Structures are given as C-alpha cells and as structure tokens.
C-alpha cells in the first residue's frame, strides 16, 4: 500500500459511482446531439472519464469474493438488482422499457463474473490452490460464463467476465500488484481504444487499504437503477412503451 494516499472500499465505490454517472450522462443525454461540436467534445471527455468505473467494480467484486460469508445471498442480490435495473437500462439507452434484442445491463456481467469466481474457489478448495485440475476446470468454467455473457449480450460481454476473473487471479502473483492490475485491464483495452483511459485506476486500486470503510450496501446497489431511470426520464420523458 502506498504511503500518503489510501482508499477504503467505500472510497473506491464512491469514485466508481461518480465516474459511472458522468459516463452515462454522456451516453444518454449527449449522444443524441453529437452533431453539435461542443456536445461531441463534452461527450468524449465524459466517456473517457467513465472508462474508469467498470474496472473498479470488477476489482471490488473480486475482493468481495474473499470476504463474503454468504455467497448465495451475494449472487441473489446481484440477480435481483440486475432484473430490477433492466427496464431502466433499456429506457435510458433506447427510450423504451423492453427490448429483447438489446444488450443487458452490467449487473448481469458482474453476476456471471461472481459465479466464475465461486466455481474457481470451489475447485481450489477441492483440488488445491495451485492444482492443475483447479486451474483447467476453473478456466473452462470462466470461458463458458464469458461465452454466456456474449450470448446474452451483457454490457462489456466476455471481456467483462474475464476482467473480473483476472482481478481475482493475477494481482497476488506479482510482487508489485500494479503489474497485476495492468494485466487484468488488458481484455478491456483490447475491446476499445478508449479503454486505455481506465489505466489510472491502477493507482487508485494500489491505494486500496483492504478496509471496507463506511458502507450502505443497499444504497450502492439502488443507485444503479435509480440514476438510469432519472437519466432516461430526462432524455425521453415518460412514455409507456
């Protein structure tokens, strides 16, 4: 942990929420106005800033797997809020509440990543932490869940699931965990040039103290559908479609 600057889990969550909000302001409110040069410039800045959000959530999920004593409850909470958020996600991004062919919200990606980590941990408990069987079978499970993310069209797709797994696996393998963080970001960076703007996250994650900080779990979960609903209403008004 670096000296002079530190962040708790709560601090990281607040930062991730803020950057996510800025990203979605750009995506929902400004994207329809890209013909305007000023709107286009602000849009690009906000989307670049927003690239820092998702990797922090991936990291915190990987950390949460280490500490949760109720994995089933954790998974059900993710699933519940993913289902609750989907209409708001559709409305914010499309202007309608339902769309079977549209991408599914990022909480589904986090859920699939969480399931991949739980399977890996179960295999490690059975075969041993570094056993080849655990590595091969865990990798196969992660690949299957990453494929499922692509099939379902979840936000960030397979790259998102793989990033979650890498945030769990890689940092402990390096003397300087910053190297592991950089490696974990590679799948995202390969999906889009803009994802390189997530690299400053490495400094924030390295400042993580391992402490949870003051948290209200329900608030952090509820913020996701609430802010999407608000942005959707600002962008599209209220429509029963």
Name every feature range the model reports, one short phrase each.
Residues 1-241:
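Alpha-helical transmembrane segments and their immediate juxtamembrane cytosolic regions
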């Amino acid at each position: 942990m670096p000296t002079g600057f530190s962040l708790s889990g709560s601090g990281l969550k607040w930062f991730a929420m803020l950057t996510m909000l800025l990203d979605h302001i750009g995506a929902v409110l400004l994207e329809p106005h890209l013909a305007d040069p000023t709107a286009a410039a602000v849009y690009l800045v906000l989307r670049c800033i927003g690239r820092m959000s998702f990797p922090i959530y991936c990291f915190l999920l990987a950390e949460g797997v280490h500490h949760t004593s109720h994995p089933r409850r954790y998974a059900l909470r993710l699933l519940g809020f993913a289902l609750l958020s989907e209409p708001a996600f559709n409305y914010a991004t499309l202007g309608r509440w339902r769309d079977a062919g549209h991408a599914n919200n990022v909480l589904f990606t986090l859920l699939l990543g969480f399931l991949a980590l739980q399977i890996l941990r179960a295999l490690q408990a059975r075969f041993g932490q570094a056993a080849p069987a655990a590595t091969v079978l865990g990798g196969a499970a992660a690949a299957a869940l990453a494929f499922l993310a692509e099939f379902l069209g979840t936000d960030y797709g397979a790259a998102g699931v793989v990033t979650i797994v890498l945030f769990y696996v890689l940092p402990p393998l390096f003397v300087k965990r910053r190297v592991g963080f950089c490696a974990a970001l590679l799948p995202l960076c390969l999906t889009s040039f803009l994802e390189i703007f997530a690299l400053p996250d490495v400094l924030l994650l390295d400042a993580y103290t391992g402490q949870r900080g003051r948290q209200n779990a329900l608030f952090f979960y509820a913020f996701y559908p609430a802010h999407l609903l608000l942005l959707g209403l600002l962008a599209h008004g209220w429509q029963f479609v």
